[in-house]
Amino acid sequence: MKLTFTKMQGAGNDFVVIDGVTQSVALSTTQLRWLADRRRGVGCDQILLVTPPDDPDAAFRYHVFNADGSRAGQCGNGARCIGRFLREKRLTRQQELLLLTDGDTLALSLSSDGRVFAGLGAPKFTPTDIPFTAESASPQYPIDVRG
């Protein structure tokens, strides 16, 4: 499968951004891992795929895949890159738009000077909301690092 992609970075995170609006995209977990591999693939922290929305109130759906091929709910730096990507690829002329994610719906604001603002909502700290397995909420959590 041949795909057109764009490599982007936002605040130190780097992404492979794929337009699933104008091209058909169906990637397996193995293919996602290969793309993210810094030695054999393109290399990135996450792969971002933008597709048409399945809700008429949203402009696009935004899929986030970690380097291991697993899904992520959303990524703030990735959302800002998606906003810039949508503007530069002329996929939208809107200045305010909603993105559907596997997590919460994100509001993006695209300024005329190229900046992108992502309304990420309030941070969540309750372990079950993140998701994170812990007996209770705590300001710090111990971790057992074996090496």
Positions of PLM-derived features:
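ATP-dependent small-molecule kinase catalytic core of the GHMP/sugar-kinase superfamily
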Residues: 91, 95-147
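A glycine-rich beta-to-alpha transition motif near the start of alpha/beta enzyme domains, typified by
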Residues: 1-112
